[in-house]
């Protein structure tokens, strides 16, 4: 099995993917029809759109720390949450996630990833600005 396909391995795989600049490893954690919520509230769907978002973050060349809060599975669905921190050039951004994963033949994969679920509007504006997005 590839990294991240066991439910408990998803969050460590995200941290490793960011810190090792492994775009392919990050995208491999998502189902083909997965959606991601951006800092400005926009929802993107599909692996190419998710790859583009991760590429933008990786281009910042920062360091990510991920602390898993929970992963609760029932049948073929799971709800997950982590607290992440991303630091680049002395600047720090962080949030709490809301995620849904679905059991696939190849293991657990994200179907919904909301990396900014725990952020207040003011925090989201700052995150969006630091990532080059101003629509919040």
Positions of predicted regions on the chain:
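A beta-strand edge to alpha-helix "cap/lid" segment located at domain peripheries
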Residues: 1-25, 35-136
